[in-house]
Amino acid sequence: MAIQRVLCANDASCEQQSHSLLPDVLVSRRVDLASVIGWALEAKAAGVGHRPIAGQLGVPAATVRGWLRRAAATGGQVAVRLLKVAREADPAGRDPPGGGGIAMLVGTAAAAAQAWSGLSDEPVEVWRFAVAHTAGRLLG
Protein backbone atom coordinates (compact mmCIF):
# COMPACT_ATOMS: atom_id res chain seq x y z
CA MET A 1 0.00 0.00 0.00
CA ALA A 2 1.38 3.40 -0.91
CA ILE A 3 0.99 6.00 1.81
CA GLN A 4 0.52 9.48 0.38
CA ARG A 5 2.24 12.50 1.91
CA VAL A 6 1.15 16.12 1.79
CA LEU A 7 3.20 19.23 2.34
CA CYS A 8 2.29 21.25 5.38
CA ALA A 9 1.31 24.88 4.90
CA ASN A 10 3.60 27.47 6.43
CA ASP A 11 1.91 27.36 9.79
CA ALA A 12 3.89 28.13 12.94
CA SER A 13 1.91 25.54 14.89
CA CYS A 14 3.07 22.73 12.60
CA GLU A 15 6.38 21.12 13.50
CA GLN A 16 6.73 18.99 10.36
CA GLN A 17 7.20 19.79 6.70
CA SER A 18 4.92 17.00 5.51
CA HIS A 19 2.33 14.58 6.86
CA SER A 20 1.35 11.02 5.98
CA LEU A 21 -2.26 10.48 4.96
CA LEU A 22 -3.26 7.13 6.42
CA PRO A 23 -6.53 5.49 5.44
CA ASP A 24 -8.90 4.98 8.37
CA VAL A 25 -8.29 1.23 8.34
CA LEU A 26 -4.67 1.64 9.51
CA VAL A 27 -3.27 2.58 12.89
CA SER A 28 -0.17 4.76 12.87
CA ARG A 29 3.07 2.74 13.04
CA ARG A 30 1.24 -0.61 12.96
CA VAL A 31 0.97 -3.20 10.20
CA ASP A 32 -2.32 -4.76 11.24
CA LEU A 33 -5.74 -3.34 10.45
CA ALA A 34 -7.56 -1.14 12.93
CA SER A 35 -10.39 -3.67 13.15
CA VAL A 36 -7.94 -6.40 14.18
CA ILE A 37 -6.33 -4.24 16.86
CA GLY A 38 -9.77 -3.08 17.97
CA TRP A 39 -10.97 -6.67 18.30
CA ALA A 40 -7.94 -7.40 20.49
CA LEU A 41 -8.74 -4.38 22.68
CA GLU A 42 -12.36 -5.49 23.03
CA ALA A 43 -11.27 -9.00 24.01
CA LYS A 44 -8.82 -7.66 26.60
CA ALA A 45 -11.51 -5.37 28.04
CA ALA A 46 -13.66 -8.50 28.39
CA GLY A 47 -10.89 -10.18 30.41
CA VAL A 48 -9.19 -12.34 27.78
CA GLY A 49 -5.39 -12.65 27.99
CA HIS A 50 -2.95 -11.75 25.24
CA ARG A 51 -2.06 -15.34 24.30
CA PRO A 52 -5.64 -16.47 23.59
CA ILE A 53 -6.23 -13.23 21.68
CA ALA A 54 -3.11 -13.86 19.60
CA GLY A 55 -4.24 -17.42 18.90
CA GLN A 56 -7.68 -16.26 17.75
CA LEU A 57 -6.18 -13.62 15.47
CA GLY A 58 -3.24 -15.66 14.19
CA VAL A 59 -0.87 -12.90 15.27
CA PRO A 60 2.32 -13.36 17.34
CA ALA A 61 1.68 -13.07 21.08
CA ALA A 62 4.43 -10.45 21.35
CA THR A 63 2.59 -8.27 18.84
CA VAL A 64 -0.69 -8.46 20.75
CA ARG A 65 1.13 -7.88 24.04
CA GLY A 66 2.67 -4.73 22.51
CA TRP A 67 -0.73 -3.40 21.41
CA LEU A 68 -2.23 -4.07 24.82
CA ARG A 69 0.64 -2.51 26.73
CA ARG A 70 0.51 0.58 24.57
CA ALA A 71 -3.27 0.83 24.89
CA ALA A 72 -3.06 0.38 28.66
CA ALA A 73 -0.55 3.22 28.88
CA THR A 74 -2.33 5.66 26.56
CA GLY A 75 -5.94 4.46 26.49
CA GLY A 76 -7.16 7.07 28.95
CA GLN A 77 -5.72 9.93 26.91
CA VAL A 78 -7.12 8.56 23.65
CA ALA A 79 -10.50 8.03 25.35
CA VAL A 80 -10.59 11.69 26.40
CA ARG A 81 -10.13 12.72 22.76
CA LEU A 82 -12.90 10.38 21.66
CA LEU A 83 -15.16 11.63 24.46
CA LYS A 84 -14.82 15.17 23.07
CA VAL A 85 -15.85 13.87 19.65
CA ALA A 86 -18.83 12.07 21.19
CA ARG A 87 -19.92 15.24 22.99
CA GLU A 88 -19.82 17.17 19.71
CA ALA A 89 -22.35 14.73 18.29
CA ASP A 90 -24.43 14.38 21.45
CA PRO A 91 -23.87 17.02 24.16
CA ALA A 92 -26.22 15.15 26.49
CA GLY A 93 -24.26 11.92 26.04
CA ARG A 94 -23.45 9.65 28.89
CA ASP A 95 -20.36 9.81 31.06
CA PRO A 96 -17.27 7.89 29.98
CA PRO A 97 -17.12 4.27 31.05
CA GLY A 98 -15.05 3.46 34.09
CA GLY A 99 -12.24 0.98 34.34
CA GLY A 100 -8.66 1.03 33.24
CA GLY A 101 -7.17 2.50 30.10
CA ILE A 102 -8.22 -0.29 27.74
CA ALA A 103 -11.76 -0.64 29.09
CA MET A 104 -12.21 3.12 29.00
CA LEU A 105 -10.86 3.31 25.44
CA VAL A 106 -13.12 0.51 24.19
CA GLY A 107 -16.22 1.93 25.85
CA THR A 108 -15.59 5.49 24.75
CA ALA A 109 -14.81 4.47 21.16
CA ALA A 110 -18.11 2.57 20.98
CA ALA A 111 -20.05 5.45 22.56
CA ALA A 112 -18.50 8.03 20.23
CA ALA A 113 -19.23 5.95 17.13
CA GLN A 114 -22.80 5.40 18.32
CA ALA A 115 -23.29 9.13 18.96
CA TRP A 116 -22.14 9.99 15.45
CA SER A 117 -24.21 7.19 13.97
CA GLY A 118 -27.25 8.78 15.58
CA LEU A 119 -26.70 11.96 13.58
CA SER A 120 -27.21 10.26 10.23
CA ASP A 121 -28.89 6.95 11.08
CA GLU A 122 -26.03 5.32 9.17
CA PRO A 123 -23.89 2.64 10.80
CA VAL A 124 -20.44 3.78 11.91
CA GLU A 125 -17.67 1.18 12.21
CA VAL A 126 -16.19 1.76 15.66
CA TRP A 127 -12.49 1.24 15.00
CA ARG A 128 -12.36 3.04 11.65
CA PHE A 129 -14.16 5.93 13.33
CA ALA A 130 -11.75 5.89 16.27
CA VAL A 131 -8.71 5.87 13.97
CA ALA A 132 -10.10 8.73 11.89
CA HIS A 133 -10.80 10.85 14.98
CA THR A 134 -7.44 10.19 16.62
CA ALA A 135 -5.45 10.98 13.47
CA GLY A 136 -4.31 7.36 13.27
CA ARG A 137 -3.08 7.34 16.86
CA LEU A 138 -5.48 4.80 18.29
CA LEU A 139 -2.67 3.45 20.46
CA GLY A 140 -1.41 6.90 21.40
Cite the ranges covered by each PLM segment.
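Short, positively charged, Gly/Tyr-enriched micro-motifs
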Residues: 11-99
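Cysteine-rich micro-motifs
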Residues: 1-15
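Long C-terminal interaction/binding lobes of large macromolecular proteins
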Residues: 77-140
